[in-house]
Structure formats: C-alpha cells, structure tokens
C-alpha cells in the first residue's frame, strides 16, 4: 500500500504506549516507534517526510520533547521508513543508524532502489553503519541488531528487552518483510539476479526463528495488527501486544508466501 503524500493528515493515528518504554507514534502503512531510554529518545523508522510534522506532534502528545531524540534507527532505507530522516536530522541533529548494505540507497549512490516511484527522497549519509551482531546502547536500551537481508540487502532486525512493573519481556522487529522487491519484475528491472534476494530472504526467516519474541513490533502496521491491538488496549486489554505466538505465526506466513512466490513467479 502506497501512501497519498498529498494528504498525509488522512493517515493520522493517536499515539499510545505499547509496553514499558516503547511507544507507537506513527501511522500507516509503515510504522514509527520511540523508545524512552532514560537518557534520550530512540526513534525507529521516522517514515515519510510529509508525515514528520504529525510524528513530532505525537511525540509531544505523549509528553516527550522531540529535541530529546538522540538516535534515529532504521530497519532499512526505503522511503516509507527513512524519507523523513534528512529533515529530522537537520532539525535536531540526532545520530543516524542504518545497515551498511543499505547506506548506498540512503546516500543516493543507488537511487533507483529506494522504492519511491515518482516521489522525492532527501538523501543523507548515515552516521553509523550497522553490522550483524552490533548493539545499539543508550540509557536502559541494549538493542541487538541482526542482519536479515532479502527485502533489501541492508535490512536489519532488532531485538531488545522491555521492563514494566518488574517484568521483563523480549521485543522483536523484523526489518523488512515485503515481497515487492522479490518479484521477478523488480529483480530483472534492477539487474539484481546475482544477489539471490529470495535465497537471502529464506535465510533471514530461518534466522528470525531462532529468536524468542514476547512483543512482536511491526515495522508495518499490518504485520502485527497494530491498530487492532491499540483498540483492544483502549478497551481494557493491557496485554494486547503480549502474545509470544504472534512471532512464529508471522514467520510461518512469510515462509508460505515465499514458497507460493517461487511457484507463481519463478525467476
């Protein structure tokens, strides 16, 4: 689903706390989250530049100051996740993090891989290149970074602990689950045959299966039914996001879709 960037306000959604220090401040189709580390905010995937004014307002609604954003972390470099980064960095000067193999998309060396159609991408040079096994640490946050290529070559998945009322749970986000970049048309148009995108995606599913996740954090709202769970929380279900079974079910569905794609759209 592509967003209508000429009418971003039509996507507005109330911000809310998911669990502990993790908050949703974004919209659809892609998600934006913040983590209050106690020593500053970490924002994951600031989204489209056209949506940034609403993201900043949502951060304020939750009682935080956007100027306290210290780190801007990206799951991958596509426009719907990183389009606002240039403007946000110019505004607050936060440090940017991105998987090393996606930095050439962000900085404009491979502009055709941004998945932007006819939309504009303000390129930027990420400050910190993320590699497999790296940790992003700030205050009470210790976020493990796992390379999970396929959707893009530099896709990064994130896993970290969240504590609330003395209870610590494991949160996890798969950095790129979309199949749009796995189609034969996309691969042939961009001459990506040598990269074995589908093989990489398969290995990334297997890698993510090794992780236990109590709180599945989607980088698109449809992955974990973000808004449905928000509504259940507002109706009184305080543990709407606390379902460890969601993660393996999500990964199994990705595997089924990949198997179907290999049959219906061979390379």
Model-derived segments and their meaning:
Residues 130-131, 149-198, 264-266:
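Mobile, glycine- and charge-enriched loop segments
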Residues 21, 35, 45, 55, ...:
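Divalent metal-coordination and catalytic microenvironments
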Residues 22, 50-53, 60-135, 235-236, ...:
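Active-site HxH/HxHxD metal-binding segment of metal-dependent hydrolases
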Residues 8-62, 66, 158-179:
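Conserved beta-strand hairpin/beta-sheet module of binuclear metal-dependent hydrolase folds
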Residues 1-8, 165, 182-267:
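Accessory terminal helices/loops
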Residues 44-46, 69-77, 96-99, 147-150, ...:
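Active-site neighborhood of phospho(di)ester-bond hydrolases with catalytic His/Asp-centered motifs
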Residues 2-3, 12, 17-19, 68, ...:
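Metallo-beta-lactamase
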Residues 51, 77-83, 103-106, 153-156, ...:
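Active-site environment of divalent metal-dependent phosphoester hydrolases
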């Amino acid at each position: 689903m592509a967003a209508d960037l000429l009418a971003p306000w039509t996507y507005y959604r109330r911000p809310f706390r998911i669990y502990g220090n993790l908050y949703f401040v974004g919209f659809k189709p892609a998600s934006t989250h913040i983590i209050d580390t106690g020593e500053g905010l970490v924002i994951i995937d600031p989204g489209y530049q056209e949506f940034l004014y609403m993201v900043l307002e949502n951060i304020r609604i939750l009682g935080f100051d956007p100027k306290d954003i210290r780190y801007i972390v990206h799951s991958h470099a596509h426009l719907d996740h990183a389009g606002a980064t240039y403007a946000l960095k110019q505004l607050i000067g936060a440090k940017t993090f991105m998987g090393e193999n996606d930095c050439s998309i962000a900085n404009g060396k491979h502009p055709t891989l941004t998945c932007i159609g006819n939309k504009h991408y303000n390129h930027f040079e990420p400050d910190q290149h993320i590699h497999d096994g790296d940790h992003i640490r700030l205050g009470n946050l210790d976020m493990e970074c796992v390379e999970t290529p396929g959707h893009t070559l530099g896709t990064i998945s994130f896993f970290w602990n969240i504590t609330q009322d003395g209870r610590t749970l494991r949160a996890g986000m798969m950095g790129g689950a979309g199949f749009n970049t796995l189609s034969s048309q996309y691969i042939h148009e961009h001459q990506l045959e040598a990269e074995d995108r589908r093989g990489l995606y398969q290995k990334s599913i297997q890698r993510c299966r090794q992780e236990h996740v109590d709180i599945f954090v989607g980088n698109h709202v449809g992955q974990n039914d973000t808004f449905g769970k928000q509504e259940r929380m507002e109706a009184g279900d305080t543990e709407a996001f606390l379902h460890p079974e969601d993660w393996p079910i999500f990964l199994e569905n990705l595997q089924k879709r990949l198997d179907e794609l290999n049959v219906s759209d061979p390379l």
